[in-house]
Amino acid sequence: HEEVDTLIGGTLLTQTGKDLRNIGVTTIRMKGRKVAGVDFRLVPLAGYEPDPVFQKQVDACYANPELNRPMGEFGNAANKWGLANWMAGAVADGIDAEIGFYHIGGVRLDSIPAGGVSAASVYGLEPFGTLVAEMKMTPADMRRMIVSKYNDPVNVKEAHRIDLISTTPYVIVTDQADNALDVEFPKLREGKVYTVAVSDYVYKNYNDLNYTDGKITEEDVTGLLLEELEEDSPLRIDNTPRQRVRRK
């Protein structure tokens, strides 16, 4: 989601940012069969008028009555943390897991106001077609997952923050340099094996996961959220953080 134009180890790395505000143009100069040079530029789209035919199609999508019809309602406004809490609870409930975790980067809206919640809002919140994954984990396994993510030396944008929002409270204990040392679970019993629900993104992409009986289920997150809206509205969203960081 950032604008990047850099050379790493002889490879041109470019990103055009988010919301389609730019397009990228790469120019490759050849001399015979050899590459003589490569350059890249970002072209802002703000100065370009939209194509009228395509704009009409986009407007029709946004005006779709089924997408804009309220599927249920929120009894209170939800902030980003509240939405993450809702999603963590939904993945847990969807597979009857004891604990749910949801990656904060997968929460694509910052807030949803109180009142009617449309299908479009839910698809905006979770646009990826994410499936629920199931694992058996002990608190030690969960601790390892959280500490490794907090100290991630590769994906530094997601490191040194609370990345995994959970239905169970926990405290990340760090040293003075903000390296995670431990995770305290006040409501879990050490050594017990719990059924844990996460997104398939976490299941497939997080390093240092330790678990048994892991699998990706057929339950999709968007469907679970829509089902809960339809069946249990008005929903009271808990915006209270259950996770925190404490410096040792």
Question: Where is each model-derived feature located?
Answer:
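Active-site neighborhood of phospho(di)ester-bond hydrolases with catalytic His/Asp-centered motifs
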Residues: 1-3, 14-16
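Short, structured coil segments at secondary-structure junctions
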Residues: 8-10
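Catalytic centers of hydrolytic enzymes
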Residues: 16-248
